[in-house]
């Protein structure tokens, strides 16, 4: 039994083994079995896709699920501290899947709990299972994770999905990674210092769009701007439009962790590069296999 706090809790070989097991699950050659297990989904921050996909993943493997989707539904709203909540949850479940607004909260929970903790998003720090889904999608599309050219577009400072992706790529030797964002939303220096592959920071996706194998888009977060006019200006300038995508190679891929707001023109959905709904379809099978490996893999 293990915790999943960061993508770097896995080795390269462990990630590839997880992906191979997910392949077998999708082809009918493997079925995760969690009969008699209980999964607690502790979402102190609102979530739709992640919470529901973990619930579906657990149920499809035969586990029971209990949990909450807001701290307002818990004793935290009465002043209970996180450590006490985690100690209570592990009395009820065999694994805790947790999302929390504070950076480092998942690591703290894992230190408190004797049962495994899976990080479903901790503040702006990481979202490891989303990165696993993203990289699984890339592998399915390209047949490899090595030597590819990636672009990350949008909010690269606060998007925890981007942090996890940049970290997981240290295991797979990309050709180059382009970081495309407004100056105020550049990737944080401490993240860049961890990277062992070529990186170039840009402000316009059009400069490199024809080179990309994978374009990973994130939404510009309104809550990060004090000036509403500045937000609207930045949001519109980082909106992926139909004409820009027409300049991409047909075999390249656009990914997005979702939810999408207005950062991808909806006309792009029918273009061959649009792979974000395919990406989302892999969430339940991969998380089902991951839950099996966390709770029953040994």
From Swiss-Prot:
Stored Pfam families: OTCace (PF00185), OTCace_N (PF02729)
Pathway connected to this protein: Pyrimidine metabolism; UMP biosynthesis via de novo pathway; (S)-dihydroorotate from bicarbonate: step 2/3
Gene Ontology biological process terms from the UniProt entry: 'de novo' pyrimidine nucleobase biosynthetic process; 'de novo' UMP biosynthetic process; amino acid metabolic process
UniProt keywords, alphabetically: Pyrimidine biosynthesis, Transferase
EC number(s) given by UniProt: 2.1.3.2
Disulfide bond sites: none
EC class: transferase
Reaction(s) the record says it catalyses: carbamoyl phosphate + L-aspartate = N-carbamoyl-L-aspartate + phosphate + H(+)
Lineage top rank: taxon: Archaea
Molecular function per GO: amino acid binding; aspartate carbamoyltransferase activity
PROSITE patterns (UniProt xref): CARBAMOYLTRANSFERASE
Chain positions recorded as carbamoyl phosphate binding sites: 49-50, 99, 127, 130, 258-259
Family assignment from sequence similarity: Belongs to the aspartate/ornithine carbamoyltransferase superfamily. ATCase family.
Protein's job: Catalyzes the condensation of carbamoyl phosphate and aspartate to form carbamoyl aspartate and inorganic phosphate, the committed step in the de novo pyrimidine nucleotide biosynthesis pathway.
Name of the protein in question: Aspartate carbamoyltransferase catalytic subunit
Organism expressing this protein natively: Metallosphaera sedula (strain ATCC 51363 / DSM 5348 / JCM 9185 / NBRC 15509 / TH2)
Higher taxonomy: Archaea, Thermoproteota, Thermoprotei, Sulfolobales, Sulfolobaceae
């Amino acid at each position: 039994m293990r915790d999943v706090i960061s993508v770097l809790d896995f080795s390269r070989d462990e990630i590839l083994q997880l992906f191979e097991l997910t392949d077998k699950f999708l082809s009918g050659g493997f079925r995760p079995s969690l009969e008699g297990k209980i999964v607690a989904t502790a979402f102190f921050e609102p979530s739709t896709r992640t919470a529901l996909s973990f619930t579906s993943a657990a149920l499809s493997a035969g586990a029971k699920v209990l949990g909450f989707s807001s701290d307002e539904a818990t004793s935290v709203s009465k002043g209970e501290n996180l450590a006490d909540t985690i100690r209570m949850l592990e009395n009820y479940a065999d694994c805790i899947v947790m999302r929390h607004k504070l950076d480092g909260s998942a690591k703290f929970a894992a230190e408190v709990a004797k049962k495994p903790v899976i990080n479903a998003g901790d503040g702006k720090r990481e979202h490891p299972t989303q990165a696993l889904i993203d990289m699984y999608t890339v592998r399915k599309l390209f047949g490899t994770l090595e030597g590819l050219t990636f672009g990350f577009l949008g909010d690269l400072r606060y998007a925890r999905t981007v942090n996890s992706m940049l970290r997981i790529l240290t295991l797979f030797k990309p050709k180059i990674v382009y970081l495309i964002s407004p100056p105020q939303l550049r990737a944080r220096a401490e993240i860049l210092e961890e990277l062992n592959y070529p990186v170039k920071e840009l402000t316009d996706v059009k400069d490199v769009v024809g080179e990309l194998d994978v374009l990973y888009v994130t939404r510009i977060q309104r809550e990060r701007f004090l000036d509403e006019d500045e937000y609207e200006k930045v949001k519109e300038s980082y909106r992926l439009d139909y004409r820009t995508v027409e300049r991409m190679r047909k075999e390249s891929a656009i990914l997005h962790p979702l939810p999408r707001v207005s950062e991808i023109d909806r006309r792009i959905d029918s273009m061959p590069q649009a792979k974000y709904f395919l990406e989302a379809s892999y969430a339940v099978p991969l998380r089902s296999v991951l839950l099996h490996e966390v709770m029953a893999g040994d």
